[in-house]
Amino acid sequence: LVPGHDAIVHYAAESHNDNSIADPEPFLRTNVEGTFRLLEAVRKYGVRYHHVSTDEVYGDLALDDPAKFTEETPYKPSSPYSSTKASSDMLVRAWTRTYGLRTTISNCSNNYGPYQHVEKFIPRQITNIIDGVRPKLYGKGENVRDWIHTEDHSSSVWDILTKGRTGETYLIGANGENNNITVLRMILEAMGRDPEDFDWVADRPGHDRRYAIDSMKL
């Protein structure tokens, strides 16, 4: 698929944290080995390459911390998923320096939008409500995510692909910080349900507290 194309944009990934905790091996195969194979293909054919990654490679921030992630924030992944994405980012940087590939990297906040996989937070809650199942919320629902619509994400990726500097990393966010309980209650109210009509469940291991993006570089 690589020969004859202007660029490769690598969106593909295993990306659900719960699944990575239950079975990390597919994440290693897809996110690390898959990236390696694409890098070798673009090295062979000299094609421009953009690598789509996640802000989760930076770990998390305290709920009361006013700071945001920047391109200079040290990597500190805290889950099997985020560690494989951090590894794939490092592969891109190494292949860029060693082989002179024309690459860029973007680390984006949490996406939402049409046709998103049902394993993700927003479509899972919507699907549960439609199916008559009470939504479930981890911990105290205090975990904060910086939400961005998929169209805004893709628009930013296009800008990086067409205007970005080779070897650079760009953070993509939308200043859309909300904690999980707020998002769930918004969904319940939008669907005509009682905003308290959900169940609390035990928090997952290593659940990141807060993500926040400083995307001023874009």
Task: Give each language-model segment a name.
Residues L1-R29:
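NAD(P)H-binding glycine-rich loop region in Rossmannoid oxidoreductase-like domains
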Residues A7-H10, F36-P80:
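Conserved Rossmann-fold NAD(P)-dependent oxidoreductase catalytic core, especially the SDR/UDP-sugar
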Residues T35-F36, A86-R93, P123-I126, S154-S155:
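Conserved active-site helix of classical SDR/Rossmann-fold NAD(P)-dependent CH-OH oxidoreductases
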Residues D60-L63, K76-T104, I129-D131:
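Active-site Tyr-X1-5-Lys
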Residues I129-L218:
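C-terminal substrate-binding subdomain of Rossmann-fold SDR/epimerase-dehydratase oxidoreductases
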